[in-house]
């Protein structure tokens, strides 16, 4: 029983870390190093504890933060960099896949809704 507790704590610490550093280029291997685990093990543990893969979690987090920044009136290219996407096109593609509309459309909808 002890081990699950400590594992879970590691994941919680990593989630906190991600929440503060989601704008940086953080790979799973870097997180695994921080946690003192193998990448393969952390990958499985992350999915078990969080219920989604690391990449999907990070993407969801970044898009959530991006939506907030777009609502706050930042330009799409600014938001792209602020949430960790150096490639503007790539950010727009990911955002569209995720939200079913481009960041600009999302921004327009937010303003219309006010």
Predicted segments with their positions:
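Hydrophobic helix-rich structural segments at or within alpha/beta enzyme and signaling domains
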Residues: 1-4
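Short, structured helix-loop boundary elements
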Residues: 7-11, 28
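Terminal helix-turn-helix DNA-binding modules in bacterial transcription factors
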Residues: 12, 16, 20, 25, ...
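C-terminal accessory/binding modules appended to enzymatic or scaffolding proteins
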Residues: 24-39, 43, 48
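Residues within helix-turn-helix
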Residues: 29, 40, 75-78, 88-89, ...
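Residues within the alpha-helical elements of helix-turn-helix
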Residues: 34, 82-83, 98
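Short hydrophobic/aromatic patch on the recognition helix
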Residues: 42, 46, 90-91, 95
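…primarily DNA-binding HTH/wHTH and HhH modules…
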Residues: 93-114
């Amino acid at each position: 029983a002890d081990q699950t507790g400590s594992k879970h704590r590691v994941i919680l610490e990593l989630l906190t870390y991600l929440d503060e550093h989601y704008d940086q280029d953080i790979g799973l291997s870097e997180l695994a190093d921080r946690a003192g685990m193998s990448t393969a093990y952390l990958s499985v543990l992350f999915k078990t504890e969080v219920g989604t893969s690391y990449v999907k979690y990070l993407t969801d987090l970044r898009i959530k933060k991006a939506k907030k920044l777009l609502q706050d009136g930042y330009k799409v290219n600014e938001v792209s960099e602020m949430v960790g996407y150096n490639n503007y096109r790539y950010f727009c593609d990911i955002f569209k896949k995720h939200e079913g509309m481009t960041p600009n459309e999302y921004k327009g909808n937010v303003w219309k809704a006010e």
